[in-house]
Amino acid sequence: MNIHPTAIIEDGAQLGADCVVHAHAVITRYVRLGDGTVVHPGAVIGGDPQDLKFDPATPSHVRIGAGTVLREHVTVNRSTIAGGVTVVGANCFLMAGTHVAHDCAVGDQVVLANNVLLAGHVSVGAYTFVGGGAAFHQFTRVGESAMVGGLARITLDIPPFVMAAERDEIVGLNLVGLKRRGFSGEVVAELKECFREVFFDGGNVRHRAQEMLARSVQSAEVRGFLEFFAGGRRGIARARRVWSAENEVGSAAL
């Protein structure tokens, strides 16, 4: 373990093996860091939530997964709920200035670029990449292996495996991300067809997804994509219909 002498680590904080805490970082007593976590200068982990109703006496926590890197001036606030936990998964990379508000749940292998802002109760699925300066409304959900462009304004849910940009616009499947995760050609083809049917065959997207689930769904990935539509409280972002002759799934960017 390597702790800079100017770092502040409160009694009660739990640090795993081989953690590194750089100058002037603050780790409050409500925090548990997994093995190999690196906290860079000026980061504040486990601070009180920015909620005017919050009682500072509430016992709540932050949990950071093993191998995660928190760059300069990252803030991760503890939960507003007694016994609640704000979670950042394992092997994540949160770049400088990122804010993770109370009660968020960030999955494993997530990258949040500089100055990404997650409001309270936002969930981000594993293997998702978010570009710099993107901001997320409270209670929004982002599915696994999604990609959200820089400076995006997200107020609605973003399903798994898609790319999103601007103001709640889905612009196609995240084909590069799927390839990097080793998805087979058969699964990618099935996801393309599923994407097209849900977003471009007319009707309510939640109803379309439910109808498709009632059929024989071949892959766990497609089932996960469709099941995502049944949850949440913010509504689902809409897809931009810009056809591409190359991929035929609705985005010239793919």
Specify the residue positions occupied by each region the protein language model found.
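Terminal amphipathic alpha-helical/low-complexity segments used for targeting or macromolecular assembly
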Residues: 1, 5-6, 36, 42, ...
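Structural signal for interior beta-strand "rungs" in well-ordered beta-sheet cores
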Residues: 2-165, 169
